Amino acid sequence: MRRSKAEQKQETIQTLIQTARTQFSELGYAATPLEKLVSDAGMTRGALYHHFGNKEGLFLAVLQSVQQEIAVRIESEASGSDDLWEQLILGCRAFMAAAVADNNRRILLIDGPSVLGWDVWRRTDEQHAMMTLRDQLQIMQTQGILKHASVDALTHLLSGAMNEAVLWIAESSERQQALEESVAAITLLCEGFRAD
């Protein structure tokens, strides 16, 4: 059965994103030659330009894909508990572990902000992991689990703390230990928001 044009288009987009993700995570954005990328994807430069405009547009699509996968992982791992407090901590752990994974670290932490600029990188974060965090905190506050405070302020505070923690974890020679220490520290921080 022949694929529709829409299916062919989606397949082309996904092939370019997956090929670029592999190369960007291994080589970095700057060191990834466009010719090799499109060749490895079995595409032409024209296909890349048609769907993404340029290499930076493709990188943005890769970053959004990484952010979406991390948000799904957060929700999946947090749903392992019915307890809202435990869900928050599980979600924080999932974010930090996913952010420092070998296939995400360079794209998310290094090239994301430098290639796209802080504002664009921040917006993609707000549309994915931060949104998941904000939703969880809002539910917890509505149910009286958190002290009364601005959910937006709490979201930015926790997100900033975790973003800084993942930079530290990524540079650590003992990543697993650094992850555990960061989860313990985030848990202590969150305890300060817990209603009595």
Question: What is the meaning of each model-derived region?
Answer:
Residues 1-3, 90-101, 130-143, 159-161, ...:
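C-terminal peripheral helix-coil segments that are non-catalytic and often amphipathic
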Residues 100-118, 171:
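Amphipathic alpha-helical segments used for helix-helix packing
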Residues 60-66:
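Alpha-helical DNA-contacting segments of helix-turn-helix folds
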Residues 1-27, 31-43, 57-60:
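Basic, helix-initiating cap at the start of DNA-binding domains
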Residues 68-71, 118-143, 152-156, 180:
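Amphipathic alpha-helical packing segments from all-alpha helical-bundle domains
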